[in-house]
Amino acid sequence: MEIRGIGFVGSHTTAHAAMGAFLRDVLGLTPIAVAGVGAALFAASNGDVLAVAPPYEEDGSKERTIGLIVDDLDGAIAELHAAGVETDGISENARWRYSHFRMPDGKLYELVEEQAGRG
């Protein structure tokens, strides 16, 4: 598996509106909309994405992640499974196909594959 880059970084906050305004108005990031994504997304000029979401639930089901870009999501998942790493099912939205997994420290990450024509 080859990690080509970081597709996005996600952050939880209770100051959702203030964070959005700061990212847009002060840092100059561009708001973007992606169908099927509940977080507010902001793009840097090189296309990197910062996601801002409400605080996660106590059970961690809304835990934010770092998305690692791969060219072949199915192949990358197979490599993780071969290494004994569990993943959840493949999900997708208008921009990415993705699957979550936990690093050795227990933190949630995901592998993301850009949808055709969206990279």
Predicted regions and their residues:
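N-terminal beta-strand motif that seeds the catalytic metal site of vicinal oxygen chelate
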Residues: M1-A18, R64-I66, Q115-G119
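Conserved active-site tyrosine of GNAT-family acetyltransferases
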Residues: M19-V26, L80, G106
